[in-house]
């Protein structure tokens, strides 16, 4: 099993134990954040990193509103040079937010159950 899959158990446990929280970041918000980061830092972030950047921006804005001072840490997992097609779609307005419906999720879970 690749290490990336093994880490999900640890992350899930940290979430369950209250050491971290999960947030919902839509695709367009994540690319907004990625482009802002690229303009500010000169690094085009990988799309998966853009979600962390967006959550960091949200948290920083909350601190700005409340006056709270805190250290905010995020993980930049890599550059986005391999996935420039996604940035091209975003910048040309062709990228949309997509959400699975509950029915889609249930259908996929049912199919996974049939694999056992």
Language-model features, listed with the residues they occupy:
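Active-site/ligand-binding loops adjacent to catalytic centers
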Residues: 1-43, 89-116
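Glycine-rich beta-alpha junction loops
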Residues: 6, 29, 51, 76-81
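Generic beta-strand/beta-sheet core signal
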Residues: 25, 46-48, 75-77
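Intrinsically disordered or highly flexible coil/loop and linker segments, enriched in small
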Residues: 43-44, 65
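Substrate-binding/catalytic subdomain of NAD(P)-dependent oxidoreductase enzymes
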Residues: 44-56
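Catalytic phosphate/nucleotide-handling subdomain of diverse soluble enzymes
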Residues: 55-116
